Amino acid sequence: MKYNNIDYQRCVLICMVVMIHIVNFSTLYPDVKNFINFFFMQAFLLITGYLVNIRKTYKEFASYTMKIIIPYIIMVTSYAFVSTLLPVRDGVNEFTIPIILNTIFVTSIGPYWFLHTMAICGIIYYLTFNLVGKWSIMGKLCLFATFLMLVSQYTPVLNSTNAAFYFTGVCLRLSEKRLDEIIKPSLWSILPFIAIASFPNYKNWNFLAVTILALSFLSFVPKLIQSINNKKVLGIIGFIGRNTLPIYLFHPIFTMGGKLALPLFHFDNSGGGTYGLHYCR
């Protein structure tokens, strides 16, 4: 079986998602967590925009979208309920219908904002490209960009930076080239990544820094993983990369459950034992 570079990228990204939501990691390495948070979900959104297929019937696309929305609603509702009982970051104080509806459709909660953004951008993408069928690709792209900007500017449901990276992924998709033909795997790309990571004020670069970090990451990660000669390891990496959605949906449950095991690893100041526990789950 041939493993796709996108699977490698998504595997590393989903592992980072799990890692930064481990409370012990956040406590031990706050600067590392902040750095990862600065760019990695934007890289994920770029890949998501690239992978979305709008060459589907309305029924097929609705089915695809509901496979995101239904689990999203279930998990957000559950997460919100648990947050009223346990000390969960970004939780809600009351479990009432208005608060839950606002959480599901407007603000989202915890890590599930990604699925919220994914669904909104995907619906706008599909509708703008299919309702104006006779328009040129450039015309459709401009219309798509306009709607993304309007929604992000005049509603609270979409972040403009996140929308921009999803849009970038769509643009790369429309080039009709493989992603690794556009963002070529190269170890050289680790240099700007390390350079920005070493700058104490890298956040002052804002969108430019996020863009460089995301593109550099998507370039050097496949090259690093390609150097692994063990086919079994590559198979596991590819499998994880192809199954990021269920991992993303359920990883808060793993991290919450992992808190109960923290006392067992009080001797481990590095936090390594806790991380191993979460990944074994």
Where are these regions (language model features)?
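Alpha-helical transmembrane segments and their immediate juxtamembrane cytosolic regions
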Residues: 1-281
